[in-house]
């Protein structure tokens, strides 16, 4: 009888272990730019260290990722608060960073999506200039840039300012038209040069445009010594990156929330800008950058 009890106990433990090891991996979806590639590598390496199985899916567009998450095909993503507010929930009201987070957390909870701890960073849009030029012309805000554009328009129309923009920004609800309205910015069509987002940084650095639309945490801002202009009218929403997980996945994986919150707690604008630069300028891989960062933090 005692042998039979031991045998049953061993079989139960074996089945439990087998079910754990054969559990479906957590599906992690990230977008198609450097910052998201780094977040993907960081998440995979750290969660695997903590005993979770992870299946990364990269280069997934925001809307596709969102729909897949709602349909339970994706378990985890790193999303930006402003994207959920404006694109997914279609709210254009200007809010503080905390209001933005609280709003998307509340609304997305109705879909079974849990917003965890937001990183202390804001990868929002901004205009940037060559630092030396911005300092020499005493331009630190978008309003001052607009005033300079108008001054040149009035006094030297043959040398009107050129702005570099990515192709998507012109059509966004937080894009060029409402920006021009908010700042009373007058631009003729030839003054706007649309290009691939990555080319904007080079165009500003090389003087091909006078100012360009950038992402504030892009490593090339620091690497190319660009000056980010203050959004003094508070036009651009907050884009704090945050781990978002399906509620049932969190409930089925104890400790997952703590692990992801640990990662988000390490990130701020300076940190992520430095990591982005290591990939975009130093040409290291996202996996190498993530591994070194986690090692330096004592997490691997």
UniProtKB/Swiss-Prot annotation:
It is found in: Periplasm. Gene3D superfamilies: Osmoprotection protein (prox), domain 2, Periplasmic binding protein-like II. Induction: Induced by osmotic stress. Part of the osmU operon, which consists of four genes (osmV, osmW, osmX and osmY). GO terms for molecular function: transmembrane transporter activity. Pfam families: OpuAC. Disruption phenotype: Deletion of the osmU operon eliminates the residual osmoprotection by glycine betaine in a mutant that is lacking the ProP and the ProU systems. OsmU deletion has no effect on the utilization of glycine betaine as an osmoprotectant when ProP or ProU are functional. One of its GO terms (cellular component) is ATP-binding cassette (ABC) transporter complex. Residues 1-23 form the signal peptide. Keywords: Periplasm, Signal, Transport. The keyword Protein biosynthesis does not apply. The keyword Cell cycle does not apply. InterPro entries: ABC_Gly_betaine_transp_sub-bd. Belongs to the OsmX family. The complex is composed of two ATP-binding proteins (OsmV), two transmembrane proteins (OsmW and OsmY) and a solute-binding protein (OsmX). Part of the OsmU ABC transporter complex, which is involved in the uptake of osmoprotectants such as choline-O-sulfate and glycine betaine. This is Osmoprotectant-binding protein OsmX.
């Amino acid at each position: 009888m005692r042998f039979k009890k031991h045998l049953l106990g061993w079989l139960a433990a074996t089945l439990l272990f087998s079910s754990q090891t054969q559990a479906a991996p957590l599906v992690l979806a990230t977008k198609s730019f450097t910052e998201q590639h780094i977040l993907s590598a960081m998440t995979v390496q750290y969660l695997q260290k903590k005993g979770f199985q992870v299946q990364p899916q990269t280069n997934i567009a925001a809307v596709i990722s969102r729909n897949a998450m709602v349909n339970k095909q994706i378990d985890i993503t790193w999303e930006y608060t402003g994207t959920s507010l404006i694109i997914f929930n279609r709210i254009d009201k200007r809010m503080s960073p905390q209001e933005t987070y609280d709003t998307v957390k509340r609304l997305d909870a109705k879909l079974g999506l849990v917003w965890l701890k937001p990183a202390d960073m804001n990868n929002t849009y901004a205009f940037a200039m060559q630092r030396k030029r911005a300092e020499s012309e005493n331009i630190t805000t978008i309003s001052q840039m607009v005033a300079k554009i108008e001054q040149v328009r009035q006094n030297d129309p043959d040398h009107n300012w050129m702005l570099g923009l990515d192709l998507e920004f012109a059509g966004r609800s937080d894009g060029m038209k409402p920006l021009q309205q908010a700042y009373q910015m007058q631009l003729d069509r030839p003054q706007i040069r649309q290009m691939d987002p990555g080319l904007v940084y080079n165009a500003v650095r090389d003087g091909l445009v006078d100012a360009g639309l950038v992402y504030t945490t892009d490593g090339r801002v620091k690497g190319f010594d660009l000056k980010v202009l203050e959004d003094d009218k508070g036009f651009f929403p907050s884009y704090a990156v945050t781990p978002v997980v399906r509620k049932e996945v969190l409930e089925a994986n104890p400790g997952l929330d703590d692990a992801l919150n640990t990662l988000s707690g390490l990130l701020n604008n300076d940190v992520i800008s430095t990591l982005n630069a290591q990939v975009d300028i130093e040409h290291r891989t996202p996996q190498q950058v993530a591994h070194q960062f986690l090692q330096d933090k004592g997490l691997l």
